[in-house]
Swiss-Prot record:
Annexin repeats: 21-92, 93-164, 177-249, 253-324
Domain remark from Swiss-Prot or TrEMBL: A pair of annexin repeats may form one binding site for calcium and phospholipid.
Record-linked Pfam families: Annexin (PF00191)
Listed PROSITE patterns: ANNEXIN_1, ANNEXIN_2
Keyword annotations from UniProtKB, A to Z: Annexin, Calcium, Calcium/phospholipid-binding, Metal-binding, Repeat
PANTHER family membership: ANNEXIN (PTHR10502), ANNEXIN A8-RELATED (PTHR10502:SF133)
The species this protein was found in: Homo sapiens
Entry GO CC: cytoplasm; sarcolemma; vesicle membrane
Protein family according to the UniProt entry: Belongs to the annexin family.
Protein name: Annexin A8-like protein 1
Length: 327
């Protein structure tokens, strides 16, 4: 399943709108959970992980109207650590959350290139447009200009190209001659020569539709006798290699890509909690069920079982509630 289809697959949703929804009692439940000494974390989990993002925004409005307080700020003051980070992430409207993740990836010393690559390579053009709009509204600057200021070289070029690209202008028609020409151009830009023409790779990967790219990858393998992924690994390195491989992976199978991100967020010593939280929150109302199925096929274990092994406490319980039952 390619990435451009994932946005319309409602069977992939793990967090759905609650039926018979009324924001007022939910807001009251949250207020009581945080009133006085101590906090009822389970009550917070039961409400916020079982409501859609739209419903959470309504709960926040009701909370403000009934109690005169900002719900997100109240949650921040009552919770802490990874659990706080997860619950607060649930309170952001989707585009604003992704804008925040991009902003956080660039602020301060160092840049988290992996976060930027993940978001820009896996979202459609319309989604990126909304993220750019939210970014400018919330931070008063252009996402494109901030990326240009914070990165350099070919990485900067591929990230800006992804922001401006037309990969999701999907057509059932693919020009076989153009696909073959693109495959030949990629071969000539890498395997055929000493050195690499990085801009040729960037231009084709970032400006062609997904259906077209799938045909290009097939033709490339016939010409080069190796996959496009293997060629990228041998011709590039570092963050540019990661960006190109991410575009290829998302074109071939978006759900497998996110399954891989979640797996490596928990594999080995330590947990990459930012990656774990971001991908579960952002995909829970899109295709997390489909990601769970690919996760089990790829790694022989369920996503929820790995979460149980790798996390603990209220943080674990909230993640499991968002992920839902095993496939």
């Amino acid at each position: 399943m390619a990435w451009w289809k994932a946005w319309i697959e409602q069977e992939g949703v793990t967090v759905k709108s609650s039926s018979h929804f009324n924001p007022d009692p939910d807001a009251e439940t949250l207020y009581k959970a945080m009133k006085g000494i101590g906090t009822n974390e389970q009550a917070i989990i039961d409400v916020l992980t079982k409501r859609s993002n739209t419903q959470r925004q309504q709960i926040a409005k009701s909370f403000k109207a009934q109690f005169g307080k900002d719900l997100t700020e109240t949650l921040k003051s009552e919770l802490s650590g990874k659990f706080e980070r997860l619950i607060v992430a649930l309170m952001y409207p989707p585009y604003r959350y992704e804008a925040k993740e991009l902003h956080d990836a660039m602020k301060g010393l160092g840049t988290k290139e992996g976060v930027i690559i993940e978001i820009l390579a896996s979202r459609t053009k319309n989604q990126l447009r909304e993220i750019m709009k939210a970014y400018e509204e919330d931070y008063g600057s252009s996402l494109e200009e901030d990326i240009q200021a914070d990165t350099s070289g070919y990485l900067e070029r591929i990230l800006v190209c992804l922001l401006q690209g037309s990969r999701d202008d999907v057509s059932s028609f693919v020009d076989p001659a153009l696909a073959l020409q693109d495959a030949q151009d990629l071969y000539a830009a890498g395997e055929k020569i000493r050195g690499t023409d990085e801009m040729k790779f960037i231009t084709i990967l970032c400006t062609r539709s997904a259906t077209h790219l799938l045909r290009v990858f097939e033709e490339y393998e016939k010409i080069a006798n190796k996959s496009i992924e293997d060629s990228i690994k041998s011709e590039t390195h570092g963050s540019l290699e990661e960006a190109m491989l991410t575009v290829v992976k998302c074109t071939q199978n978006l759900h497998s890509y996110f399954a891989e991100r979640l797996y490596y967020a928990m594999k080995g010593a330590g947990t990459r909690d930012g990656t774990l939280i971001r991908n579960i929150v952002s995909r829970s109302e899109i295709d997390l069920n489909l990601i769970k199925c690919h996760f089990k096929k790829m790694y022989g274990k369920t996503l929820s079982s790995m979460i149980m092994e790798d996390t603990s406490g209220d943080y674990k319980n909230a993640l499991l509630s968002l992920v839902g039952s095993d496939p």
